[in-house]
């Protein structure tokens, strides 16, 4: 057999074999299959790229530091933070996934190790570690923060989460501070932080009133937080409380009457005497801030003051000293004329009844008086429209949450309707 004959037989044998294995077919696909079988193996998928901060060997890291794990071509599945003794540090991931926030401030002058694991789109994993050291306790002046939301309480449906700052927070530093303020609700309800113009207070509220029975947990994680160039935060503050029944008070100067509403229904009307023209009561939407069975009003240190009086069943509405309280000396005026220094006078019996019905966090609305409530004179989060409130956030606010129109357009309506916009000008 010649050389060309032998070569022809070999080629036929190779080509014919797939035809036999393929079964009864007339299609000649063997050359294609041969080419596929001889193609080079695909390149292995690259590992996901994983970057951690604080960067490895970082020093003088603030005790408020958060851990970020950024990945390209995959997703982060594990982040562990451990102290220098190997004890794990609990951390919670931000809702937007941008960082892991330790649930307590880190210790000063301490070393921490972060381990993160990411899985690539093709299933490959990569692990990265970083070690950093926190700064010593700062010697910079502290901003004193006050959380006006106590632990283990029951509040009214209009209760805003309020934090005060001394000194006030400069506009340029507000975004950094706001990122360290956390509110969670059960059941979930959207909410937004909004700053007073002067930076002395920040409020958190929902578009509508809180639902009765809601549990609200708050954390102001400010300990060691750099605030601007020359200040630091003072402490981490936390609290968890619940929202009680829906109660609202409406006071009309024209009629000298207070309407008390529970779940949107009037349950009592009370005659009142408000501030006389020289010391008028403010019009606007306020929130009950404090309740005292007995207290003393002493205005001798004020320019237009000069009296001391003991009062019973007093409920604070403003920082400037407007209260609802029992006033036996003005019972004959209540429902007819205004004689007070700015407070809302009611009879001792009505004051006692109100103390049993109201909660800190209940909404109180005044209409028809000579002056308007000043922003920040009390917890004035409801004394503006939702659209204006959102503009006070130092961070972008996702579009979406808006107030639900109430069935009855009045501030005492059941949660599900925000009060109509109120004034926010100056008061005396």
Per-region residue spans from a language model:
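Conserved beta-strand and immediately adjacent loop positions that scaffold enzyme active sites
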Residues: 78, 115, 257, 313-314, ...
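Gly/Pro-biased beta-strand-loop elements
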Residues: 227-332
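Extracytoplasmic/secreted envelope proteins and their assembly/folding machinery
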Residues: 68, 113-115, 129, 162, ...
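Exported/periplasmic cell-wall-interacting domains
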Residues: 157, 245, 283, 292, ...
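Soluble periplasmic/extracytoplasmic beta-strand elements of cell-envelope proteins
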Residues: 68-70, 80, 113, 162-164, ...
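Short, charged beta-turn/beta-strand-edge "cap" motif at the junction between a beta-strand
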Residues: 118-120, 222-224, 264, 294, ...
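Acidic, low-complexity Ser/Thr/Gly/Pro-rich repeat segments typical of extracellular/periplasmic
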Residues: 2-245, 400
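Short amphipathic beta-strand/extended segments with alternating polar/hydrophobic composition
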Residues: 92, 194, 265-274, 376
């Amino acid at each position: 057999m010649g050389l060309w004959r032998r070569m022809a037989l070999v080629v036929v044998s190779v080509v014919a074999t797939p035809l036999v294995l393929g079964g009864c077919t007339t299609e000649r696909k063997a050359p294609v299959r041969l080419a596929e079988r001889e193609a080079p193996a695909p390149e292995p998928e690259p590992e996901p790229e994983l970057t951690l901060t604080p960067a490895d060997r970082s020093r003088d890291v603030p005790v408020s530091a958060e851990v970020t794990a950024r990945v390209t071509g995959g997703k982060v599945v594990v982040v562990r933070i451990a102290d220098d003794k190997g004890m794990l540090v609990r951390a919670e991931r931000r809702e937007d996934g941008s960082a892991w926030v330790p649930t307590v401030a880190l210790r000063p002058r301490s070393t921490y190790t972060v381990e993160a694991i990411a899985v690539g789109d093709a299933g490959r994993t990569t692990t990265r570690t970083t070690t950093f050291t926190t700064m010593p306790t700062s010697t910079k002046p502290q901003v004193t923060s006050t959380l006006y939301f106590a632990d283990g309480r029951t509040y009214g449906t209009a209760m805003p989460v309020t934090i005060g700052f001394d000194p006030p927070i400069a506009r340029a530093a507000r975004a950094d501070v706001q990122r360290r303020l956390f509110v969670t609700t059960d059941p979930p309800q959207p909410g937004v932080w909004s700053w007073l113009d002067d930076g002395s207070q920040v409020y958190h509220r929902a578009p509508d009133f809180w639902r009765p029975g809601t549990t609200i947990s708050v954390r102001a994680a400010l300990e060691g937080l750099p605030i601007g160039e020359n200040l630091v935060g003072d402490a981490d503050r936390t609290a968890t409380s619940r929202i009680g029944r829906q109660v609202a008070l409406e006071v009309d100067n024209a009629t000298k009457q207070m309407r008390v509403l529970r779940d949107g229904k009037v349950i009592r009307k009370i005659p009142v005497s408000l501030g006389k023209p020289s010391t008028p009561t403010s019009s606007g939407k306020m929130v009950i801030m404090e309740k005292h069975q007995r207290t003393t009003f002493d205005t001798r240190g004020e320019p237009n003051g000069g009296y001391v009086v003991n009062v019973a069943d007093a409920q604070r509405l403003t920082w400037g000293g407007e209260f609802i309280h029992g006033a036996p000396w003005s019972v004959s005026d209540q429902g007819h004329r205004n004689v007070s220094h700015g407070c809302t006078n009611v009879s001792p019996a009505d004051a006692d009844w109100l103390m049993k019905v109201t909660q800190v966090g209940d909404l109180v609305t005044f209409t028809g008086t000579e002056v308007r409530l000043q922003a920040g004179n009390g917890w004035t989060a409801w004394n503006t429209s939702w659209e204006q409130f959102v503009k006070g956030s130092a961070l972008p606010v996702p579009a979406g949450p808006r107030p639900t129109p109430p069935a009855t357009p009045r501030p005492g309506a059941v949660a599900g309707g925000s009060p109509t916009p109120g004034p926010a000008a100056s008061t005396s």
